[in-house]
Amino acid sequence: MTRTDQDSWDLASSVGATATMVAAARALASTGERPIINDPFAAPLVRAVGLDFFRRLVDGEVAPADPQRGERDLQLETDSIAVRTRFFDDFFTGAARDGIRQSVILAAGLDARAYRLDWPAGAVVYEVDQPKVVEFKTNTMAALDARPAAQLRTVSIDLREDWPEALRANGFDVTQPTSWSAEGLLMYLPPEAQDRLFDNITALSAPGSRLATEYHPDATGTTMAQRAQEFNDRWARVGCDIDLSGLFFDGERSNVVEYLTGRGWRVSARPRRDLFDDYGLAYPEDDETAQFPNIVAVSAELG
């Protein structure tokens, strides 16, 4: 797959297919021996998308051609998505516990937090994503008879367009503190769009707002294109027949911690390995997982 500046997608193509992949990993992570997340909507959503490989994956029908490496790669990807999901789950529940009642999930994909987290009374959750993605998930959740646990407001727009105006038009209150998530998103944006995303978040945020994201510091000399190919190769060994390479935008990026700090955010950052330790999952130490310690989970507070 090759990206363009104005490309769009549904949940069976391009970047949208990775949202389905992540949902499939959440479904598997929710059914392990000692799950650290619980997403009962992940598997039904994956089945509804209809991509054959991911449907078979959540139904236990995938047999990797190389069982040893394929199963290992699948476990690594599943555990990695599990700790990432738990990090963002804890971020939102912590912000709500501390009194924040307005939340925005950017590039929401098949995220079901508005339905599955324990939101307090008065909580409003905004989900922002491509129109086809929003329409599909809204219709599918209705067909599943799922009810949001917070007041859910969907915003159908590409994040490369004027999404702040669309957010305000849907009732977003710039005077209230907000909890923001940009999960699994930054590598799918051109470098300048990443900066613009954080500028827009900052402009929309009242003091006390919080932000959670993750990024890949360029500390290993590995380009985004190389990381995308490694990502694709791991899934290919599992048996995935969908080309997931070519989806990341290359180019020199701002250091997320430095960029946010320079705009008034108090930032903390932790490597992915620490999250494995926090949530009691074993982290595999070898050359094939070299990029994972370089993934950094970021949380920040404004003002």
From Swiss-Prot:
One Pfam entry name: LCM
Spell out the molecular function terms from Gene Ontology.
Answer: methyltransferase activity
Q: Which positions in this protein are listed as binding S-adenosyl-L-methionine?
A: 129, 158-159
List the PANTHER family hit by this protein, alphabetically: S-ADENOSYL-L-METHIONINE-DEPENDENT METHYLTRANSFERASE YKTD-RELATED (PTHR43619), S-ADENOSYL-L-METHIONINE-DEPENDENT METHYLTRANSFERASES SUPERFAMILY PROTEIN (PTHR43619:SF2)
Q: Which organism is it from?
A: Mycolicibacterium paratuberculosis (strain ATCC BAA-968 / K-10)
One GO process term, biological-process aspect = methylation
* Function, as annotated: Exhibits S-adenosyl-L-methionine-dependent methyltransferase activity.
What name has this protein been given in UniProt? Answer: Putative S-adenosyl-L-methionine-dependent methyltransferase MAP_4197c
Q: Which InterPro entries match?
A: Ppm1/Ppm2/Tcmp, SAM-dependent_MTases_sf, SAM_mthyl_Trfase_ML2640-like
